[in-house]
Amino acid sequence: TQVQEEELFKYLETHDKQLLLMIKFVSYNFLRPIEVCRLQIKDINFEERQLVVDAKNQLQKTKIIPELLFKEIEHLKGTNPNYFLFAPQGVESWETNESNKRDYWTKRFKKVKEVFGMGSEYGIYSFRHTFITKLYRQLRKTLTPHETKSQLMLITGHTTFTALDKYLRDIDTELPADYSNLILQASR
């Protein structure tokens, strides 16, 4: 829920700012946790506010960094380009494989989930679903479904309408209006 999300962000702001920043990369840049784990300083173009990401389905993709996220990392300009954005003690080198990195962050988030009594169905990846859903619903307030999906594709990095449609269906982005009248009419 919106309240739960706000409480969780507030808790992380006090107790684990680094984990919060990781979640913001997933939430605001619509990255997968494994993609966030790969990020190094050299992947950030500070002048253009862009990020080069080693993605799931293509070698690399370039994404803009939204202003509300960029403000939190602009101080890193000039840091060792080979440092990872997300290492156990902050921005530094981290010599281990990607699976270990993702597992580390998953376990770190698990401790926060325990504080909030959240079940195993919630993970860092859930924030990607949540924020894509929020963005979709916000865009739908003023755009047609097709226009919404066109805009969303640019933001999320989905490369085809088919892939985006499947993703949106899988996370129940659009719910129908109450259809009680249809049931009543069909029952006559």
Where are these regions (language model features)?
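Basic, Lys/Arg- and aromatic-enriched nucleic-acid-binding interface segment
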Residues: 2-33
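Basic, Lys/Arg-rich DNA-contacting stretches centered on the C-terminal catalytic core
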Residues: 11-13, 34, 47-71, 78-79, ...
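Short, basic (Lys/Arg/His-rich) helix/loop patches that form interaction surfaces
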Residues: 13-14, 79-81, 106-154
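Short, charged phosphate-coordinating catalytic segments
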Residues: 26-48
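Short, polar N-cap/turn motifs at the start of nucleic acid-interacting alpha helices
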Residues: 43-48, 141-168
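Catalytic-site neighborhood detector that most strongly recognizes the C-terminal catalytic loop/helix
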Residues: 56-58, 156-182
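Active-site/catalytic core of tyrosine-dependent DNA strand-transfer enzymes
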Residues: 66-119, 138
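C-terminal secondary-structure termini that scaffold catalytic or DNA-interacting sites
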Residues: 91-93, 181-188
